[in-house]
């Protein structure tokens, strides 16, 4: 994917014209100014559950100011607007990832020691190029300096909009607080609330010799977070922990249940409490998929996301053999199977709120951008129609974060948009046929490689 900057946007106008898009020179000169009135015309738009159009949308100051269908007086409405004719292509909202990690990966290594502003910007730009407009870094994330955080949060030139849970509580790397009694848990939450975070993250799991956070502690942490106005997302693996977390009032289960098949009691609890459920199926699949399917490396959609170091690793026959036969890979295959089984059961039951994410960026093989599109495919394979899977990744994912200004193509919404060369309602993998990505009304990425 070609990532646009002020320096190279003029170079790419030839590519735009070759692709059937001819923004005039005035728009090019005003690129990034935030003041240009822009019209995308002759484009089919995902409105609700249907792909409508072709029609047009107007964008002003980074937001959608009008959505026009074929019967509207488009000539009058488009007067004085800079026109981008998309020649019958398809428009969907940009995705929101409720569960990712930003700035932790460098080559084939991962960890907080890799976090720098430059590395964080690179990760956010990669998410953005793949159509993810908003990213929640759900734990393990150092607190950026105020200027860096402002760039990461509100400036499309630095990539997807950034939200964060900060370091989190009871993280497996041992670098975040591990409260042992309820009052400690409350104090830790109060301390975290003083930082520029958007959500509280808890890890409730067994990591080697580390015993999980006690129920008394996570109940206290959840209660304190709610008193301070924060939602709580919980890492979870077992059904037992998931049930206890839902009962304690956790707002979000940040992973699918993978140890056993879920039961009706759990389904009823999710519905009753309104708890969000983020399956993150690809998280475990990423452990082995690049070893099992070496032909993936020939896919340009993946190649664009790989660092040279990671590409070399995936290309190694020795690495593939060692990885594919490892105990970790075998366990991951079992977890994916159970996760999909439970996801299908929840979809069939209905009434459960799904969030979206793939835990991309936590480990090198969980590749930002590619991971989210693969996760969409898992949602469909588990039983969601493509239009509903896209709804999970857009409107529902925004709703999980209480972001009412994005996730839909509608007047007043942020112009965070993906232009596609094929209809994703026909085949969910058509979300990978990216023609352009817009964020807050700015063209930020052009084309599928």
Model-derived features: positions:
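Acidic, glycine-enriched loop/beta-strand segments at the rims
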Residues: 45-56, 69-72, 367, 385-390, ...
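Histidine-rich, glycine-flanked metal-binding segment
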Residues: 29-37, 45, 49-92
